[in-house]
Amino acid sequence: MMAETRKILGREDIGISPTCVRVPVYTGHSEAVNVQTREPLSPEQCREILSGAPGVLVVDDPNDALYPLAIDVAGRDEVLVGRIRRDPSHERCLNLWVVGDNLRKGAATNAVQVAELLHERGLIRRTETPAPA
């Protein structure tokens, strides 16, 4: 998990401390994420930033028991983020709960998004497949 995250982010120096837990769910990955920022960031600021991120849906209202569940992302492309709160152990850390459908966002949808990005950058082009005779 550490090597994969560093590779995805393109940063070998990033500090990561993962714990993998397997639970019997039909589909989906859930992650407890601890984020340390350069400057203090309030949970409200974090919600606002994440709300503007493409492919991210903030589901975060603990007072109404509204937070992301793995069942909520089955068949969806969006990644849901909630339980955004300060980490009491560090003034520049926040804790988040993140869920996503690994079959869509982790595989199929990501493959399509990568192909679209490569096409936009002119690195691949669409070719016509000849009709069968």
Residue locations for each model-derived region?
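NAD(P)-dependent Rossmann-like dehydrogenase/reductase catalytic/cofactor-binding core
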Residues: 78-80, 85-133
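C-terminal substrate-binding/catalytic lobe of Rossmann-fold NAD(P)-dependent oxidoreductases
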Residues: 1-95
